[in-house]
């Protein structure tokens, strides 16, 4: 990242698991199904830079009834707070932290952000309480219309207003909705932030990154196979998650936004473009710069090798030296592609 500041999103994800043999599986709330069910839950931290997401850290939540010898029970709040500390100690430059109401309602988590003087935008419950001195009251400002811009650059009209508890404070409270008349539950958010200044036009987009990352991670789970394991031992599950996150990171690193951060990688990419082989001439090459576009292109790069090993057993039955030679030439050409990998 070359010292560039990033936005950090804290979120938990739960996956349904049948039976009771898998480590740390219990009946608990699973966001993926929107109800309490049998499953495993992890708390995850993601980075966002220039509309590209990348994984930073994952910690499994261990319900009390599933603890093993040597385990210590930690709440999701404690796990998230540990993540913030570890990310700061790793030297990440964090310009903003986003989280849902589980963390927004936690004074422990907010204290951890304050400890590092981090800016935050967090969701809170609609019945969030604030202590007020006698004689002070709660009031709501007028609704302000703004354009909510999404990652695909499309926009929709939203409405925002500040809720003031007594006197003006360094921490401010906001309502964001699609319809100020009906306040639909599924498209109305209650938000708390320590950001200063005129936030009416910017806060909606900043907080919207959180839901966008949630959606993006669901796609990642579907595309990369986050839940496609048959292990019951958590060490094996954790290893699987690490592999998925490594692939996720590799795809993100090959996005134009992150490639451009490092001069040597930029030169390498330019050299790649000036090569006599122009991979982007492939009929199915995607020229957009989003995460799924990069994933599509990396899949095209590995296709010849995968297809070769699918066909190879048949060459024992139907020998074809020309086909074998052609595959060798094609794979050699594909090996000239220079993807970006994380250093260290």
PLM segments and residue spans:
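Catalytic-loop motifs flanking and including active-site residues across diverse enzymes
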Residues: 41, 212, 239-245
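A conserved active-site cap/scaffold subdomain adjacent to cofactor or substrate pockets
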Residues: 186-192, 205-207
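Active-site-proximal structural scaffolding
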Residues: 113, 123-125, 184, 213, ...
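Short amphipathic alpha-helical "interface-anchor" segments enriched in bulky aromatics
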Residues: 10-14, 103, 200-231
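A short, flexible helix-boundary coil/loop motif
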Residues: 52, 56-62, 69-77, 81-85, ...
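Conserved, well-structured functional cores that handle cations and Mg-NTP chemistry
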Residues: 1-98, 102-129, 136, 147-150, ...
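Structural motif
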Residues: 32-38, 231-241
């Amino acid at each position: 990242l070359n010292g560039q500041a990033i936005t950090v999103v804290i979120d938990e994800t739960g996956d349904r698991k049948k039976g009771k043999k898998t480590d740390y599986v219990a009946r608990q709330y699973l966001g993926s199904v929107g109800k309490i069910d049998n499953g495993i839950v992890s708390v995850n931290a993601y980075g966002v830079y220039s509309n590209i997401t990348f994984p930073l850290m994952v910690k499994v939540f261990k319900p009390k009834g599933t603890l093993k010898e040597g385990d210590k029970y930690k709440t999701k709040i404690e796990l998230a707070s540990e993540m913030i500390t570890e990310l700061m100690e790793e030297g990440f430059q964090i310009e903003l932290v986003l989280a849902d109401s589980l963390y927004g309602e936690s004074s422990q988590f907010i204290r951890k952000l304050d400890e590092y003087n981090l800016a935050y935008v967090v969701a809170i419950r609609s019945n969030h309480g604030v202590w007020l001195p006698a004689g002070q009251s709660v009031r709501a400002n007028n609704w302000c219309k703004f354009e909510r811009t999404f990652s695909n650059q499309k926009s929709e009209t939203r409405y925002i207003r500040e809720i003031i508890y007594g006197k003006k404070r360094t921490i401010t409270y906001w309502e964001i909705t699609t319809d100020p008349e009906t306040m639909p539950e599924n498209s109305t958010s209650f938000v708390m932030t320590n950001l200063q200044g005129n936030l009416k036009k910017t806060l909606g987009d900043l907080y919207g990154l959180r839901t966008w990352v949630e959606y993006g991670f669901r796609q990642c789970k579907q595309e990369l196979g986050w839940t496609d394991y048959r292990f019951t031992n958590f060490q094996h599950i954790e290893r699987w998650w690490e592999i998925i996150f490594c692939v996720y990171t590799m795809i993100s690193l090959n996005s134009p936004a992150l490639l451009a951060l490092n001069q040597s990688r930029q030169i390498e990419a330019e050299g790649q473009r000036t090569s006599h082989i122009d991979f982007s001439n492939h009929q199915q090459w995607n020229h957009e710069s989003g995460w799924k576009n990069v994933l599509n292109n990396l899949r095209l790069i590995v296709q010849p090798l995968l297809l070769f090993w699918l066909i190879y057993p048949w060459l024992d039955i139907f020998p074809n030296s020309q086909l074998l030679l052609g595959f060798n030439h094609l794979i050699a050409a594909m090996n000239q592609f220079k993807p970006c990998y994380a250093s260290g």
